């Protein structure tokens, strides 16, 4: 295999996937909505519109890709103001994914790797790390859209001879990370007291270069065909442990105050932040044994190595501002 298409290639995960693919000798076409932001060395293909309408008619002449790694999505947001969140997510994450699959199949692509999310399964593990056989129970519109896209994509692939691989990551971190993980780093770096010093809940996370490595393996390994894989770092730290690791990486110990989980949940209910607190106090561990058994894949980086790389970026970012 030599030709890959990566959607969302100018995003956080997309840049990491493209970098790893180029380093491995692949030719990469970056399918993006807006120009700019891609790494050097890729062929940029701008298609305005996240729903991929008309993609088949605008497929570049001469592009004969072997696989598509599909990262583009309407992403999860904490306070979605759409009048119909399910419809808004489905328009991009479900209908758009199917349009992409149809266009890719029409133009000879043999495999699509779909970057789903553990949110397609749920928000907590119930005391047992979530495997690929766990009964899905998505809790929000984003998770529901990801699950629907998985199922419809698998049906389309089975009916049309398109190889489909689904990858479900948890929270992704690494250099250029944004949103909640960056806010957490800001809080630790500024020495803010955090009431999370006694949270035993364990949360799987994945370093962006580990995820990129797994996605590329799924695009190229024949044993991945038809599979669904949970992908995460090897260790799932407790919430308290993660904050300490972040502090170590930043060279600034996290200021942690021991507040029982039950108290935090009560405060969350009183302040209207129940969902956010539940995500901190409930465990969400992934069972990643399947990708190891089927593909022999292991994360190339430890969580500590990933956090050190993220902290190095964070420090350089602050010196450049």
What are these regions (language model features)?
Residues 4-24:
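N-terminal Rossmann NAD(P)H-binding glycine-rich loop of SDR-like oxidoreductase domains
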Residues 47-94, 99, 103-106, 121:
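NAD(P)H-binding glycine-rich loop region in Rossmannoid oxidoreductase-like domains
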Residues 98-141:
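Conserved Rossmann-fold NAD(P)-dependent oxidoreductase catalytic core, especially the SDR/UDP-sugar
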Residues 99, 177-183, 197-219, 226-227:
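Substrate-positioning beta->alpha
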Residues 137-165:
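Active-site Tyr-X1-5-Lys
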Residues 174, 196-201, 229-236, 245-251, ...:
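Glycine-rich Rossmann NAD(P)(H)-binding loop
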Residues 208, 241-244, 267-298, 309:
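Conserved C-terminal active-site "lid" loop/helix of NAD(P)H-dependent oxidoreductases
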Residues 217-275, 304, 308-311:
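Mid/C-terminal beta-alpha module of Rossmann-like enzyme folds, strongest
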